[in-house]
Amino acid sequence: MTSESSTPTGSTRALPASITRSSSSTLSTRPSASTPASTGSLTPSTSTASLVVSPPPARSPVVSTRATATTRPRLAAERPGSATTPCPCGDTDKQLAPCLQEGAGFVIRNAAVRLYMRFGRVWFWHCMLGLWGVGNLIW
């Protein structure tokens, strides 16, 4: 079965019967006896699987030893290379004075620091810790 429909240009064309009317193409379904009626909420789970609690994994003695070991910063004498790198400044105020008077050193938290410029970067020597550091020069 076909019916005619007009197009925007006024011509008519044949349409298949299944789309002539939207009400005739919509099928109604009846709930079957095996399909439960929907209430809009989730149905309780009917799984037969049982919950088994597994024991916690065994702790490795090596991992616990590492986790509980205390860490402290190395002293200057313990650091590699510290014996061959002399500190350009001293530990006392009198020893710090020459570093500060040269204009190349300054004090950060009561520790002398020497600055050096190389390759566009600032290198600094922390006298108290015996460490080198580097940073970018920002003007």
Swiss-Prot record:
Involved in drought, heat, cold, and/or salt tolerance. The keyword Phosphoprotein applies. It comes from Zea mays. Embryo. Keywords: Phosphoprotein. Transmembrane segments: none annotated. This is Stress-related protein 1. Residues 14-53, 60-74 have a biased composition (Low complexity). The gene is SRP1. Residues 1-86 are annotated as: Disordered. The modification Phosphoserine is found at residue 60. Residues 1-12 have a biased composition (Polar residues).
